Amino acid sequence: MLKSLKFLLVFIILAQLLSCTPSAPYEIKSPCVSVDIDDNSSLSINPCIRRPINAVNIV
């Protein structure tokens, strides 16, 4: 019974790790501050952009 519990625990951990990784490789851009900043305005932050990497680079 102890072996089955260990197997179940390892299986759950592997399932969690595999669910966290995206299916295709993505280039993740971090939020950035826009270049045009006025002295009186607050900083505008663009949302994070996820773009697929070129299919040629996929191994």
Curated annotation (Swiss-Prot):
Alphabetical list of InterPro entries matching this protein: DUF2706
Transmembrane segments: 7-24
Keywords: Membrane, Transmembrane, Transmembrane helix
Entry GO CC: membrane
Pfam family, one: DUF2706
Topology term for the membrane: Single-pass membrane protein
Subcellular location: Membrane
Protein name in the entry: Uncharacterized protein RP288
Organism: Rickettsia prowazekii (strain Madrid E)
